[in-house]
């Protein structure tokens, strides 16, 4: 219950009376026998109440709280009207008898009491100023909160005394409790009287003298025991009488206090107020009757029959003829708005009548007691429906206006949004709580300011402009051509409005373009990204949309089983709940009938518009990304960021699509109607998916061209494949395209591996023939053979890694895609159906797919979720992550036929057994409809279950069908892609075999022609090592490729497997020496390969081939093992040494990469980091051994060579891990692809100094020396003698004593220097509050010197700029203050941070962020690599964009003013030449007329003054281009000219700095946009951020 309602008086009267203070004194007497401590003074209670009432008041303080759980009353929004509070409290009292009821605050007063209740009570309220109302409400709420806390702390009497003392003196007459009042219900009630009732004695009087003493004692004891165990009826009656008396007097006193307060507020006596209330209550039956018979009176509004009302709302997408469209069109839109406005005013008036009626009673129970119709069910339903309609209509109207403000749209009615003006600032008498309004305002501010803040700096800047774009700005941007692109289509938003697509008409549809959101979308994507944009829009709109959706759901709609889960893949964006809260489900059952009876207009149009606006904003993001696609082929350095943006917009678009469908599926009665107006959105989603696929194909092709392409390639492909599996099911036709694309990519990897092998062999052969043609000495020939052998081993090793990654990805594709087996009917369809019926199969009926025949086993008939998962799996959805347990025996049979007539002829259309109806998702139905199924498919969820289910099905239906494909995909396009992938894998087997033959042929010819007998044995050793490495590669590849094959491909790979084994055995018999009784280590992998031959491969051989293979195996094994004591005739053994693959200079120090393990490819799955961590010592030893082997000639050791001894030499930088070379290379390592050389820096061979690495300016070295000096000072202080220690102690004691005396004002303090803070304050600068100590000088510029500085309090290292000036030099102080003002206004991670200033008489100290890695000019002296240039350029462009958006022109952008930090960030600083523009929105060139800056970086308009017009922000863009040239070449532009006047002359004559040739095409295009001579054509910083040159990933995903 709310507080006691005072007599309705106009709001001006409230201001005259101390209502805020007396609000706490209002009682709200419940009819229950407990007191309310918030309602009456404690002194009055102690006088009137008994001890029991006081105890009950103290017993349960929680029940007297003002805050009640109001969520369960109406369900659409918290019941915040005083009427709603009363109804909730009355219901609470009925449900919990004997518990005190709580009150809620009365927010507004009613109209004057003299007015008739039938008059329009809203007119008097409209005259009140909104400002005074809000101020009064805030003061009252604050006072209530404070005093309530005091009451709960047992300070009630003290607070009442203080409040009473603060009130104006006014006589309050005494109230007679026994006096009857007309307006109080307890006055005529009969007072309960409790009198002691004599109880008749029934026991017979017995003479005690007749009983013995022991018997008498026994009798007395028995009587006492019986009395103790029984409850006295007398005491029970007396106790009940006392409770009734206390409750009566408590309720009576509360009602009298309420009457007294009503009289006090109205300025009447108690008797006059009593008479007034009695008279006013006579009109209550008429008010109740008017509410019960209320129906909206539209008066003179002529509306057509197809208006959007609850009786018959027009369904979205309803078709009309063009004539109806033109006739009904806009008139229906304006008519709906008029209906909304009229209905809102009338409902508001009827609710005010209800408030007026309830204000005449102290509680709702008292009102219900006098008028039973008020408590009737029909009255409650009617009032609840009115509250529901009023709350949701007002809420949706407000959210539409908020969205218009956020999106920068002012004239909402021009674009067809159903927004109407609310005539009063308080239309529904406070129906919406203040907290909700304030929360909405906070969310709006967050959304507007969110586009200005970065991820690193969540606090918005005070100078950030609001994200509100005027219509003029939109029209300007539209006229500039940024909207009319080739992908732009006219898509009206009228399809989201409840009165249909055609109703807007041609006049309104021309305004309904999604391009009106373009300025907002462009800015939001750049400044906070799509993910934050979706999160904030969802936070702003989701609550209102959910409440409206629950109210619009029709309960009489037939419910069919359908699978519509929340998007699990979007859980990091927003959480969608498939079921609304239970408290919100209660409203629609009552509301719909009542709303129809009252002829209220539907709020469905506003709901549909809001849902569509969210979808259209994301649609515009899709369009923007499509238009920003680079025209040419993107480079490797920018394609990663482009792929990342594609994935982000695809994920966001699908999330918003599912949210839109979730909101509208039950409102519009089915997803078919929801999908009918999303064709344009679906088309753009498909286009974006195709763009993503093109980027992926280009990316993999570029990576394959790198020398070390095998590193991390599989991880990249797995990540992209997992993402594609999640999203493609929700895009039309996406599953088949995705499967085909990734099969092509895997085949492309296998083909490129073969090409890499052939090109490497071609280079080796060419080098060998070149060395042979030189006719050099034997030493040169030997060196050439050794180098080529080593190169071949590296070639086979890299080809092995590439093939391993490609095969691993191909096997993963096969596991995910091959989930079906294809059968061909060998009998008629009738026989098959009879067999299925005999096996108790169940047919699955899908509405709309009558030509698709689906059968499942009888065990799955009740498992509809499993059937839906099987259907999803058949269409390509990844079901491996579903939380439900997967049935091992779950499968379905799928076949499809053309028309129903043919089905009836073939027998497919006749099924007389059991059938079950399933309604899948719309995407599943679309895919099933477009699938081509020629034969019968058996589909399972996972490929691991396919073999078992296929064999079981074949046995059950034996003789009726034959297997065509044992394992294939359910979609023909993917099945063809998998077949092509297997053919590519078989082709690589042939290319590996050909490569080994080529190496054998190459070395055989060389040795036969050129090598002498004495050198032949040594060179044969290297030749055999290369051959064994090639064979080992072939072994591992053949063993792995077998696992990829199925069906007829297994027989093909079996033939190649046996052929390769025969090739190896022949090589061993002809080129290798016989063994000595044990198996040599080099033959281990060959023997393992022979053991892995499957019996199926051998069984397919003809008898002659099998016998020859058997004989060859026996001969090979005998030759390799040999006899224990075979003599060694040669100086060196001819058997190959244990193969050691020499590490490439870019390989990680991993022992597994040096010596291949017998397990083959399986060891490659271990991450290199994990392998390196535990084997660093072994890796170092292996590296040393490899280096020794590579440097020297092979020693005579035979097959089992002795490991090389470690040599104490200088550390090899190539053998170590990543050396600490250039800092730029370490930053670039995060951006570069993992397979790039880890020692690609030109400075990799440099030795690092013992002291900390320094930059060219020596700033880091000096700071290191400063820290060393401080540590030495501390060490010297610790070595003091006893005398120094005593003196120091005395000095510290004196300082503490003086400090304590100064604190007590006993002594003063002499100031050495006068305070100059007044000078700081008048310029408004931030002064430092920390103690600091100056360090070394690190630089000197035009305006002062720069030192390092340490904060004594925190130890933080800062930069301190010292500026000296003459005393009273106000000009210098003002110029410096202007620079600091520019600093203070902005806080961004790419701008140097400003801490404060300290001003003295002749100098000023400016404290700034210290950038410890020097300037960009210093690190660019040797030129930078392009990926680093791109990273730095992006950060500089972001910093310039932030300055320009704040209206600041830097005017001195150059390498010396751009600073680097150890974290890799670029920071733009030195704002000495910057200027703050007066007009932020102005973007024209002529903004500044002074010439400042550095000549080499000056724009032409700065030098020429633009013929008197001045220059603007475009000058910074020219300087940015000059900085990029400096990073590329290492020299500033125009470095060949010595004087500034020469440079100014060249630039002024229209010459541009030459663009470096070694820059990529994207970089050259970027520079051409920066170095435009005409500033009007030159791109802005915002446009440059969309260029492909700066599309780099600044952080790892």
From Swiss-Prot:
Activity control summary: N-terminal autoinhibitory domain interacts with the C-terminal kinase domain, inhibiting kinase activity, and preventing interaction with its substrate, MAP2K6. The GADD45 proteins activate the kinase by binding to the N-terminal domain. Activated by phosphorylation on Thr-1494.
Region (Disordered): 1-128, 424-465, 1137-1157, 1190-1220, 1233-1263
Polar residues: compositionally biased ranges: 1210-1219
Subcellular location, record wording: Cytoplasm, Perinuclear region
Protein kinase domain: residues covered: 1332-1590
Complexes and interactors: Monomer and homodimer. Homodimerization enhances kinase activity. Interacts with CDC42. Interacts with TRAF4; this promotes homodimerization. Binds both upstream activators and downstream substrates in multimolecular complexes. Interacts with AXIN1 and DIXDC1; interaction with DIXDC1 prevents interaction with AXIN1. Interacts with GADD45 and MAP2K6. Interacts with ZFP36; this interaction enhances the association with SH3KBP1/CIN85. Interacts with SH3KBP1; this interaction enhances the association with ZFP36.
EC number: 2.7.11.25
Sites of Phosphothreonine modification: 440, 451
A family per Pfam: Pkinase
GO molecular function, one term: protein serine kinase activity
Reported tissue expression: Widely expressed. High expression was found in skeletal muscle, kidney, testis followed by heart brain and lung. Low expression was found in spleen.
Catalyzed reactions: L-seryl-[protein] + ATP = O-phospho-L-seryl-[protein] + ADP + H(+); L-threonyl-[protein] + ATP = O-phospho-L-threonyl-[protein] + ADP + H(+)
Comp. bias (Basic residues): 84-94
Residues that, per the record, bind ATP: 1338-1346, 1361
Keywords: ATP-binding, Cytoplasm, Kinase, Magnesium, Metal-binding, Nucleotide-binding, Phosphoprotein, Serine/threonine-protein kinase, Transferase
Family: Belongs to the protein kinase superfamily. STE Ser/Thr protein kinase family. MAP kinase kinase kinase subfamily.
Comp. bias intervals (Acidic residues): 59-69, 449-458
Protein name as catalogued: Mitogen-activated protein kinase kinase kinase 4
Biased composition range(s): Basic and acidic residues: 1241-1250
Any one Gene Ontology BP term: positive regulation of p38MAPK cascade
PROSITE patterns, per database record: PROTEIN_KINASE_ATP, PROTEIN_KINASE_DOM, PROTEIN_KINASE_ST
Top-level EC class as recorded in UniProt: transferase
Cofactors named for this entry: Mg(2+)
């Amino acid at each position: 219950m709310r507080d006691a309602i005072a007599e309705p008086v106009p709001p001006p009267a409230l201001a005259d009376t101390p209502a805020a203070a007396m609000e706490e004194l209002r009682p709200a007497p419940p009819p229950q026998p407990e007191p309310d401590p918030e309602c009456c003074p404690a002194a009055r209670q102690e006088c009137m109440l008994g001890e029991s009432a006081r105890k009950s008041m103290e017993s349960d303080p929680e029940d007297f709280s003002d805050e009640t759980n109001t969520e369960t009353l109406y369900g659409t929004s918290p019941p915040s009207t005083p009427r709603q509070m009363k109804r909730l409290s009355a219901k609470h009292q009925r449900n919990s008898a004997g518990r005190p009821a709580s009150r809620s605050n009365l927010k507004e007063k009613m109209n004057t009491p003299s007015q008739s209740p039938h008059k329009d009570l809203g007119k008097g309220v409209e005259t009140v100023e909104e400002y005074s109302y809000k101020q009064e409400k805030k003061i009252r709420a604050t006072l209530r909160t404070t005093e309530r806390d005091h009451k709960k702390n047992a300070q009630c009497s003290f607070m009442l005394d203080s409040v009473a003392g603060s009130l104006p003196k006014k006589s309050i007459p005494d109230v007679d409790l026994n006096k009857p009042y007309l307006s109080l219900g307890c006055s005529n009630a009969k007072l309960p009287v409790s009198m002691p009732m004599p109880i008749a004695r029934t026991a017979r009087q017995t003479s005690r003298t007749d009983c013995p003493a022991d018997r008498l004692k026994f009798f007395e004891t028995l009587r006492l025991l019986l009395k103790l165990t029984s409850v006295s009826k007398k005491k029970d009656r007396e106790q009940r009488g006392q409770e009734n008396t206390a409750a009566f007097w408590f309720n009576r006193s509360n009602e009298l206090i309420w009457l007294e307060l009503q009289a006090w507020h109205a300025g009447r006596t108690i008797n006059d107020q009593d008479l007034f209330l009695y008279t006013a209550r006579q009109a209550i039956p008429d008010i109740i009757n008017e509410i019960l018979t209320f129906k909206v009176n539209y008066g003179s509004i002529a509306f057509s029959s197809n208006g959007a009302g609850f009786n018959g709302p027009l369904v979205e997408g309803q078709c009309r003829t063009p004539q109806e469209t033109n006739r009904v069109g806009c008139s229906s839109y304006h008519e709906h708005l008029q209906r909304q406005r009229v209905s809102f005013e009338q409902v508001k008036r009827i609710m005010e009548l209800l408030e007026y009626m309830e204000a005449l009673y102290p509680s709702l129970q008292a009102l219900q007691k006098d008028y039973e119709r008020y408590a009737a069910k029909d009255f409650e339903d009617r009032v609840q429906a009115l509250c529901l309609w009023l709350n949701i209509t007002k809420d949706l109207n407000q959210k539409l206006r908020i969205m218009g403000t956020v999106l920068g749209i002012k004239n909402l009615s021009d674009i067809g949004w159903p927004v109407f003006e609310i005539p009063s600032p308080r239309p529904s008498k406070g129906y919406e709580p203040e907290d909700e309004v304030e929360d909405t305002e906070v969310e709006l501010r967050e959304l507007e300011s969110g586009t200005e803040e970065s991820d690193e700096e969540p606090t918005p800047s005070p100078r950030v402009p609001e994200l509100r774009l005027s219509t003029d700005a939109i029209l300007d941007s539209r006229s500039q051509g940024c909207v009319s692109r080739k992908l732009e289509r006219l898509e009206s938003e009228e399809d989201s409005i409840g009165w249909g697509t055609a109703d807007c008409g041609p006049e309104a549809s021309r305004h309904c373009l999604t391009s009106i959101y373009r300025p907002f979308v462009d800015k939001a994507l750049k400044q906070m990204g799509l993910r934050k944009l979706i999160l904030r829009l969802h936070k702003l709109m989701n609550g209102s949309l959910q409440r409206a959706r629950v109210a619009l759901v029709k309960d009489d709609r037939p419910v069919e089983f359908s699978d519509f889960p929340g998007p699990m893949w979007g859980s990091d964006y927003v959480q969608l709940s498939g079921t609304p809260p239970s408290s919100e489900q209660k409203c629609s059952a009552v509301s719909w009938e009542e709303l129809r009876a009252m002829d209220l207009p539907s709020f469905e149009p506003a709901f549909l518009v809001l849902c569509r606006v969210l979808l259209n904003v994301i649609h515009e993001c899709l369009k923007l990304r499509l238009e920003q696609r680079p025209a040419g082929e993107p480079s490797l350095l920018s394609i990663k960021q482009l792929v990342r943006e594609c994935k982000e917009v695809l994920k966001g678009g699908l999330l918003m699509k599912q949210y839109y469908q979730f909101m509208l599926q039950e409102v519009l009665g089915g997803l078919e109607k929801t999908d009918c107006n999303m064709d344009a959105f679906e088309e753009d989603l498909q286009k974006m998916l195709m763009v993503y696929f093109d980027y992926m194909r280009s990316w993999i092709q570029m990576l394959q061209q790198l020398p070390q392409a095998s590193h991390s390639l599989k991880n990249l492909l797995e990540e992209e494949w997992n993402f594609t599996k999640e999203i493609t099911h929700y895009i039309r036709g996406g599953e088949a395209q995705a499967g085909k694309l990734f099969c092509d990519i895997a085949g492309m990897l296998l083909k490129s591996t073969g090409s890499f092998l052939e090109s490497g062999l071609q280079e080796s052969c060419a080098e060998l023939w070149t060395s042979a043609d030189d006719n050099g000495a034997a030493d040169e020939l030997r060196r050439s053979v050794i180098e080529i052998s080593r190169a071949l081993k590296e070639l086979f090793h890299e080809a092995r890694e590439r093939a391993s990654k490609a095969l691993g990805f191909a096997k993963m594709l096969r596991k995910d895609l091959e989930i079906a087996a294809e059968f061909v009917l060998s009998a008629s369809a009738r026989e098959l159906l009879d067999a299925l019926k005999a096996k108790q199969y169940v047919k699955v009926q899908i509405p709309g797919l009558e030509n698709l025949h689906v059968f499942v086993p009888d065990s799955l008939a009740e498992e509809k979720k499993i059937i839906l998962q099987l259907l999803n799996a058949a269409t390509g959805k990844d079901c491996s992550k579903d939380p439900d347990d997967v049935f091992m025996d779950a499968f379905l049979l799928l076949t499809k036929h053309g028309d129903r007539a043919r089905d009836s002829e073939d027998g497919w259309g006749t099924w007389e057994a059991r059938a079950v109806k399933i309604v899948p998702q719309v995407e599943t139905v679309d895919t099933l409809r477009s699938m081509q199924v020629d034969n019968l498919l058996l589909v399972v969820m996972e490929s691991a279950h396919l073999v078992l289910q296929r064999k079981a099905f074949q046995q059950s239906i034996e003789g009726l069908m034959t297997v065509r494909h044992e394992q294939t995909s359910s979609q023909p396009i993917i099945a063809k892609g998998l077949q092509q992938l297997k053919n590519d894998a078989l082709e690589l087997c042939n290319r590996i075999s050909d490569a080994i033959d080529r190496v054998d042929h190459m070395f055989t010819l060389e040795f036969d022609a050129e090598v002498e007998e004495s050198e032949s044995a040594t060179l044969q050793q290297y030749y055999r090592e290369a051959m064994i490495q090639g064979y080992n590669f072939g072994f591992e590849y053949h063993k792995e490729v077998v696992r990829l094959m199925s069906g007829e491909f297994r027989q093909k790979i079996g033939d190649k497997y046996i052929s390769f084994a025969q090739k190896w055995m022949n090589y061993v018999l002809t080129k290798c020496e016989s063994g000595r009784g044990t198996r040599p280590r080099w033959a281990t992998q060959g023997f393992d390969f022979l053991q892995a031959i499957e019996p199926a491969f051998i069984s397919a051989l003809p008898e002659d081939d099998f016998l020859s293979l058997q004989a060859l195996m026996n001969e090979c094994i005998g030759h390799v093992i040999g006899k224990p004591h075979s003599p060694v005739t040669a100086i060196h053994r001819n058997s190959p040494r244990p193969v050691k693959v020499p590490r490439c200079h870019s390989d990680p120090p991993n022992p597994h990469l040096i010596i291949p393990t017998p397990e083959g490819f399986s060891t490659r799955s271990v991450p290199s980091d994990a392998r390196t961590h535990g084997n660093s010592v072994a890796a170092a030893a292996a590296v040393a051994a490899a280096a020794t082997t590579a440097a020297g000639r092979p020693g005579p050791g035979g097959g089992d060579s002795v490991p090389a001894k470690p040599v104490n030499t200088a550390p090899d930088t190539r053998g170590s891990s990543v050396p600490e070379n250039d800092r730029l290379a370490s930053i670039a390592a995060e951006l570069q692809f993992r397979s790039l050389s880890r020692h690609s820096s030109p400075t990799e061979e440099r030795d690092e100094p013992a002291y900390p690495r320094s930059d060219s300016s020596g700033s880091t070295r000096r700071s290191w020396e400063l820290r060393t000096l401080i540590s030495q000072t501390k060490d010297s202080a610790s070595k003091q003698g006893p005398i120094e220690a005593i003196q120091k102690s005395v000095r510290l004691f004196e300082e503490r004593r003086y400090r304590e005396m100064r604190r007590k004002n006993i002594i003063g303090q002499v100031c050495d220097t006068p305070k100059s803070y007044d000078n700081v304050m008048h310029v408004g600068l931030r002064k430092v509050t920390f103690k600091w100590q100056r360090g070394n000088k690190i630089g000197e510029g035009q305006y002062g010197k720069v030192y390092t500085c340490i904060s004594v309090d925190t130890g933080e290292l800062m930069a301190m700029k010292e500026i000296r000036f003459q005393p009273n030099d106000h000009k210098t102080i003002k110029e410096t203050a202007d620079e600091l003002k520019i600093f203070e206004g902005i806080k961004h991670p790419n701008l140097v941070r400003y801490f404060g200033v300290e001003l003295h008489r002749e100098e000023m100290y400016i404290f700034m962020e210290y950038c410890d890695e020097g300037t960009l000019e210093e690190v660019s002296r040797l030129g930078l690599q392009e990926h680093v240039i791109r990273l730095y350029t992006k950060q500089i462009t972001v910093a310039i964009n932030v300055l320009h958006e704040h209206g600041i022109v830097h005017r001195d952008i150059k390498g010396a003013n751009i600073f680097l930090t150890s974290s890799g960030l670029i920071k733009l600083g030195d704002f000495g030449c910057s200027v703050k523009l007066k007009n932020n929105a102005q973007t024209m060139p002529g903004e500044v007329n002074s010439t400042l800056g550095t000549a080499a970086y000056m724009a032409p308009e700065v030098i020429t003054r633009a013929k008197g017009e001045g220059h603007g922000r475009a000058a910074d863009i020219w300087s940015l281009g000059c900085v990029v040239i400096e990073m590329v070449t290492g020299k500033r532009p125009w470095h060949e000219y010595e004087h500034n006047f020469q440079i100014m002359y060249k630039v002024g004559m229209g010459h541009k700095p030459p663009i470096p040739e070694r820059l990529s095409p994207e970089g050259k295009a970027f520079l051409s946009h920066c170095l435009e001579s005409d500033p009007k054509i030159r791109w802005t910083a915002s446009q440059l951020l969309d260029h492909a040159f700066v599309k780099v990933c600044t952080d790892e995903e």
